Every structure is written in C-alpha cells, then in structure tokens.
Curated annotation (Swiss-Prot):
It catalyses: UDP-N-acetyl-alpha-D-muramoyl-L-alanyl-D-glutamate + meso-2,6-diaminopimelate + ATP = UDP-N-acetyl-alpha-D-muramoyl-L-alanyl-gamma-D-glutamyl-meso-2,6-diaminopimelate + ADP + phosphate + H(+). Disulfide bonds: none annotated. Catalyzes the addition of meso-diaminopimelic acid to the nucleotide precursor UDP-N-acetylmuramoyl-L-alanyl-D-glutamate (UMAG) in the biosynthesis of bacterial cell-wall peptidoglycan. The lineage of its organism: Bacteria, Bacillati, Actinomycetota, Actinomycetes, Kitasatosporales. The keyword Signal does not apply. Coiled coil: none annotated. InterPro entries: Mur-like_cat_sf, Mur_ligase_C, Mur_ligase_C_dom_sf, Mur_ligase_cen, Mur_ligase_N, MurE/MurF_N, UDP-N-AcMur-Glu-dNH2Pim_ligase. Meso-2,6-diaminopimelate binds at R395, D419, N420, P421, R422, G475, E479. One of its GO terms (biological process) is cell wall organization. Carboxylation is probably crucial for Mg(2+) binding and, consequently, for the gamma-phosphate positioning of ATP. A motif (Meso-diaminopimelate recognition motif) lies at residues 419-422. It is found in: Cytoplasm. The gene is murE. This is UDP-N-acetylmuramoyl-L-alanyl-D-glutamate--2,6-diaminopimelate ligase.
Length: 506
C-alpha cells in the first residue's frame, strides 16, 4: 500500500504507549496500545500511529481524529481542547498543554533516536541556506553516504523527494532520519529555518555542526522584528541544538552570534576579516564560477573553487568547506568535493539555448539577495542587465518597496511582475513595488516596465536582450507552480525563460 507523506522506515520496534506517557509525565491511558509511528497529518496516518492532533489557526487537529482512527491510529497526542474529541473516537489520548512542543521528542523516541547515528550539519541564515546545504552535501559525498533536506528537495542517497517546506515537521523529520539510518546513510546536510526553530520542527535534534550564513530582514510577518528573528536563529547555537557553530563574521549579526553563542564557535570570512579563523584569499570571480585560496587557523592553504558565480557564493563555498573541516573531513578533499557540485536548482541556474546573451534564473526574493545577485551579474555583463522580479503575496509587505528600488537601481531594465500573489491583488503588490522604483533618482534608475502576467514579463525582458547582455529572472528559482488566488498552476521560470528564448531564436 502507498501512503501519503515522506517515507518511513520499513523496520521499527513498537513503543508501548505507557512508555511515552511516562516520558511526558502524564498518566498512562487504559489499555496496552503499541506505537509504531507518529504523524501530525490525519491523511497520512498508518496503522499503529500516534496521531498528533494540534491546535491550528482555523481548525484543530482533533477535528480529524475520526478520520485518523479509521486509518488505524492507535492513540492521540493532543491538548485539553482536543481530548474530549479523541475520547469520542474511542482512542486513548496523551494530553499535554502544548502538544507541538512535545511532538519532536516523542517522534525521536518512537523511531529510536535515529539522528544520533548520523553526522548532522545544519545550516541557518536568511540567504545561502540552500546553496550551502548542497555544497556541504557535495563535500560529504567524498567520504560518506549522504542525505540532504531543504527547500528544493530531500535526498536519501540517490532518491529524490519533493519538499513541502524548508525544514520538515518533527514527525516527518525523525522518520526521514530513521529511513536514512536504515538505508546506510552516514551524514546529512540540512537547512534549518527560523520557523523550524520557533515551531519545534528540530526538537530532539542536536546538530554536530551548525552553520550561520547571514541575517537580514525577512519573515517579518512571522517575527516581531529583527531582534526576535536573531534570537530565533541563535537557538541553533545552544547546547540543546548543536555541538559546534560555524559563523560568518562578515555579517554584523554573525559577529554578535560568535560572541553570544553558548557552544564553541569557528568563524569564517570571505572578505578577509583578520580575526576570522578561516578566510578567503586571492579571490577571482568569474562569470560562471570563482576560485580562491582558503587560509586556515593552522596555516592551511587550500585551493578552492565555487561552482556558482558571485561573491556571495564564495562565502557559501567557504562556509561549506569550513563546516566540513570542522566535521573532521580533510579540508582539501572537502574543497574538491564542493567544487565538483554541478549546481543548485534555481540558484543562478543558467538557461542556454545557444543565444548570444546570458540568461539565468535565481531564487533571490529578499532585498539584499536581489542586490547581491544584480551586483554579481553586473560585474560579468558586457552589455545591459535586464531583470524580472516580483514580490509574493500574504508575506512580508515591508520588503516590497525596497525590492522595487533595488531592481530599478541595479538593472538597466527592471521588469516588475507577479510572483506568487496568493490571496492578494497582484496589481496592488506591483503598485507598492513601483513606488519603490520611483523613489530611485532618475539618473540612477533603469527603465522600469510592469507586466502583471509573469510569462509576458519574461518574454519582454528576453525581447530586449542583445549580444553581451544578461537576463535575470528572480524570485521563484526552483519553484514549479504559481499561486494566484489560492490556485497553484504549473509555472517554472526556467521553462518559461527557455521557451521565450527559443521564440527569439526563430
């Protein structure tokens, strides 16, 4: 039988419900239920599962307890509000005030604490998580059987699984770790979002290495401000969550974190910060990749190559090499493995149909990331730079004007368009972006165009491109759908860009 959701281990020992009750410090329900899995999704329940019925913004997971029971749930983890409904369904219940806060530890127990048998490297930061995770996994492959968990996909060996979110829920994450252990995986590179840290998705995880890339305004619809955002990230650098930190001291929040972290910290700098333990030197940035020398704390000189363009990818590559060295890999072997990574989906991903201009798709969807990628492309563009950009709906509204200003300032042609409008009016989002673009003085501003339709915007940018120019389509990267008014329709920037180029090629 095929079940929805991420994979689960084939072999698992049952855990008595009474043992889980004892772990929670609550009275054991009547009966002798045995638990062989856990899920927070009533649709993904398997026989023998503990169904975590969590309170939500609109609905309570206990509303679906009858469905869970019908699929074979053996018991329920819930709060007092959900306990009565669980009893009505005839299921024994573990009742705690905050079931989400206890879900991770129970999942780890049920699956036999699989994370303890894996070398775990977690990466957090506003930008660079995905790229750094791919580079770390590439380096790990030189010495170990690997797994990858992140925004684009999850990988167990050569099996690829589409990701629902950057960091899976704790129930799914512990199951993934158990599958990795069962299949002989030795090490995993994983993105850790601030949401994951705040919402308990990485509860029961203790990362061998925790990497901090940078911090800039993002997710302000979730965090109360930058201090709250920083404190969320800083949780990863405590003994409860990691054993060693690898921190970028080119970033102001990284410098603060290096001082405030309560685990040992190794620092790195792509800009040659004299106090950093590891530094990038002799950096040569090219149109497709960069080379540099890594200087280590013991006089190491390591030849390194970033397989991706841009100074920011020098920083990501350095982060990966330092993390791998901190994990005990030979630094030069690690650097060679990182250099061999073929690319990262949707991160400065080139689209080449033989056209006489450079065309790339990138996930940049924050002001600093947009500026960074435009600056990097400007350095390697002989002609003009044409950029397509939108802002997502139902997300941080404060970044819309700054992003409009950034693309207008750093591109010769700024084509403003829809991203994922979700429930918002696309034209209202574009109007705010246009205000930002208009705030840039005329002598510093490129030509600004507005197309509500994203495919039309991409076609317009391609139509303007001449030999030696660059076309950047930013914001969605690897995504393969566009959310408009709650309906997700197929849309892949890479494919749409490819088709637009083909049409110009005749």
């Amino acid at each position: 039988m095929t079940y929805p959701g991420p994979p689960r281990p084939v072999r698992i020992s049952a855990t008595p419900l009474a043992e889980l009750a004892d772990q929670l410090g609550v009275a054991a329900p009547d009966g002798s239920a045995e638990i062989t899995g856990i899920t927070h999704d009533s649709r993904a329940v398997r026989p023998g599962d503990l169904y975590a019925a969590l309170p939500g913004a609109r609905l309570h997971g206990a509303d679906f307890v009858t469905q869970a029971a019908g699929l074979g749930a053996a018991a329920v983890l819930t709060d007092p509000a959900g306990a009565e409904r669980a009893a009505a369904a005839g299921l024994p219940a573990l009742v705690v005030d905050d079931p989400r806060a206890r879900m991770g530890e129970l999942a780890a127990t049920i699956y036999g604490h699989p994370g303890r048998d894996l070398l775990q490297i977690g990466i957090t930061g506003t930008s660079g998580k995905t790229t750094t995770a791919y580079l770390v996994e590439g380096g790990l492959r030189t010495a170990k059987s690997t797994g990858l968990i992140g925004t684009v996909e999850m990988r167990i060996g050569d099996e690829r699984i589409k990701s629902e979110r950057t960091t899976p829920e704790a129930t799914d994450l512990q199951a993934l770790f158990a599958v990795m252990r069962e299949r002989g995986t030795e090490a995993v590179a994983m993105e850790v979002s601030s949401h994951a840290l705040v919402l308990g998705r990485v509860d029961a995880c203790v990362f061998d290495i925790a990497v901090f890339t940078n911090l800039s305004p993002e997710h302000m619809e979730f965090h109360s401000g930058m201090e709250d955002y920083f404190q969320a990230k800083a949780q990863l650098f405590t003994p409860k969550r990691s054993r060693l930190g690898v921190v970028n001291v080119d970033d102001e929040y990284g410098r603060r974190l290096a001082k405030e972290a309560t685990v040992p910290v190794v620092t790195y700098s792509a800009e040659g910060h004299p106090d950093a333990d590891w530094r990038a030197d002799e950096v040569e940035v090219g149109p497709l990749d960069s080379t540099f020398t890594v200087l280590g704390p013991k006089g190491e000189r390591i030849a390194a190559k970033s397989p991706l363009a841009g100074p920011f990818n020098v920083a990501n590559t350095l982060a990966a090499i330092v993390a791998l060295a901190a994990a005990g890999l030979d630094p030069q072997s690690a650097a060679d493995g990182v250099a061999a990574v073929p690319g990262v989906p949707g991160r400065l991903e080139r689209v080449d149909e033989g056209q006489p201009f450079f065309a790339v798709v990138d996930y940049a969807h924050k002001t600093d990331a947009v500026e960074s990628v435009l600056r990097a492309l400007r350095k390697v563009t002989e002609g003009k730079l044409h950029a397509v950009l939108g802002c997502g709906g139902d997300r941080d509204t404060t970044k819309r004007e700054p992003m409009g200003a950034a693309v207008a300032r750093f591109a010769d042609t700024a084509v403003l368009t829809s991203d994922n409008p979700r429930s918002e009016d696309p034209l209202a989002i574009l109007a705010t972006m246009l205000q930002g673009a208009a705030s840039v003085p005329a002598h510093e501003r490129g030509e600004v165009q507005v197309f509500e339709d994203r495919a039309a915007a991409i076609a317009a940018a391609v139509a303007r491109a001449e030999p030696g120019d660059t076309v950047l389509v930013a914001g969605k990267g690897h995504e393969q759908g566009q959310d408009i008014a709650g309906v997700v329709r197929p849309f892949d920037d890479r494919q749409v860009l490819r088709e637009a180029i083909k049409k110009t090629q005749g």
